[in-house]
Regions:
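Conserved hydrophobic segment flanking the Walker A/P-loop of ABC-type ATPase nucleotide-binding domains
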Residues: 26-28, 348, 356, 362-366
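ABC-family P-loop ATPase nucleotide-binding domains
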Residues: 75-140
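A short, flexible loop at the N-terminus of ABC-type nucleotide-binding domains that lies
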Residues: 1-5, 9-21, 130, 334-336, ...
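Catalytic Walker B motif of ABC-type/P-loop ATPase nucleotide-binding domains
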Residues: 162-166, 171, 179
């Protein structure tokens, strides 16, 4: 077995239960996607599997060497590229040996990995990270470069088990294609969290995490969606039938009460005409009321049962919340000049090389709509920071009008 999850639960510090009683076995070499609504605990589950978080109860086991690519990298700021890749100690030992220090501890640390530098440079080149120093701080890389670095480490380490949390985030087209190819050909056990349908369709099994636990489907994402739709339609039909039955039960109970009231009124009038003594009339009335009460209780129990079944069905229906973004119209008139850039360029403190071989010149006006596209590390985020004033160009000038932004 490669991944075993047994009776696993996790509770937030505010006592809110995120998930409970999770059980799952992923056999060696299997490739599985973990899906579910935002906030259901997918990332927390992978962090527990990676040993970066502790469960409330239960246990997890991952066989062999495990490699984890997180969704966010802030916790690694302050580390160098070599430290992130986990090769800094080996490199130190290698350089010490090459410089004549033959202490036994260096050989033990290197562990006969004499071509560690060559292998590292090869995977960095494959992930379009050639030219990046192994001593460069992680925070000096773009979001896409950070993702590529962790994925390069995945190839460098050749692990038995891979945990990938949103690995296509920040990746450009070329980076995504390389990831798809790697996932397709690797023999490692793979567990992936992603919203990338192309990646999800490469995986032959889907496990959905929800408030009801883990439900697994034998098939890729398209198959999973089809099965979910069939299941949802069946639940919806059951719900409609139960709601119809509830309306009928309430109508029947109401009609019975009305009919009983009319019968009681007619019975009392008839008894008075026949001269039945009041004491006997009271007994007959009590008997009728008891019978009516028992019948009402039967109908009430039936109605309550149907209502509970409806509640359970509604709870079983998958959530279909959809993201909707509505930007209010700008108060600025169309065509107002917001940003004017003249021959701007930028380089970070740890580099003397400009981001762009040709300086950028452009003008932004209110009402314009632009899409900034480019490879990872081409400077898209840096350009936005220059536009908003978060960064200052190291060359050229940029002028900004007073405007708000998100």
């Amino acid at each position: 077995m490669s991944i075993i999850i047994k009776d696993l639960s996790y509770t937030h510090t505010d006592k809110e239960v995120l998930f409970s009683n999770l059980n799952l076995i992923i056999n060696s070499g299997e490739k599985t996607a973990l899906t579910g609504n935002n906030g259901c605990g997918k990332s927390t589950l992978t962090r527990i599997l990676a040993g970066e978080a502790l469960p409330g109860t239960g246990s997890v086991h991952c066989s062999g060497h495990l490699y984890y690519v997180p969704q966010h990298f802030g916790q690694y700021d302050g580390r160098t590229v070599a430290q992130v890749l986990g090769i800094d100690r080996k490199l130190t030992a290698l350089h010490a040996i090459l410089n004549g220090d033959v202490a036994e501890e260096h050989f033990a640390r290197l562990d006969d990995d004499w071509n560690i530098e060559e292998r590292t440079q090869a995977v960095l080149h494959a992930w379009h990270l050639n030219g990046i120093s192994l001593l460069r701080p992680l925070e000096g890389l773009s979001g896409g470069e950070k993702t590529r670095l962790f994925l390069a480490g995945m190839e460098l380490k050749e692990p038995d088990t891979l945990l990938l949390d949103e690995p296509t985030n920040h990746l450009d087209t070329a980076g995504r294609k390389r990831l798809y190819d790697f996932v397709h050909r690797t023999s490692a056990t793979v567990l992936v969290i992603s919203h990338d349908r192309t990646l999800l369709n490469l995986l032959p099994a889907i496990c959905e995490l929800s408030r009801n636990g883990l439900a697994c489907y034998g098939g890729n994402y398209d198959f999973y969606k089809e099965q979910k739709e069939v299941h949802r339609n069946a639940l919806q039909q059951q719900l409609e039938e139960k709601e119809k039955a509830l309306r009928l039960a309430r109508k029947t109970a109401r009609e019975m009460e009305e009919r009983k009231a009319r019968q009681n009124t007619r019975g009392e009038k008839a008894s008075i005409k026949k001269g039945i003594p009041r004491i006997l009339l009271g007994g007959l009335k009590n008997h009728a009321e008891n019978s009516s009460s028992k019948l009402s209780n039967v109908h009430a129990e039936k109605t309550d049962k149907i209502q509970q079944e409806i509640t359970n069905l509604k709870g079983s229906l998958p959530q279909t919340n959809k993201l909707k973004i509505d930007f209010n119209a700008s108060a600025l008139h169309i065509g107002k000049i917001l940003v004017t850039a003249q021959n701007i360029n930028f380089h970070y403190p740890d580099s003397n090389t400009n981001l762009w071989t040709v300086p950028l010149s452009f003008q932004l006006r209110s009402g314009n709509r632009f899409c900034i596209k480019g490879d990872n590390g081409s400077g898209k985020t840096t350009l936005l920071k220059l536009i908003t004033g978060e960064l200052t160009p190291t060359g050229g000038t940029i002028e900004r009008a007073d405007f708000t932004y998100i």
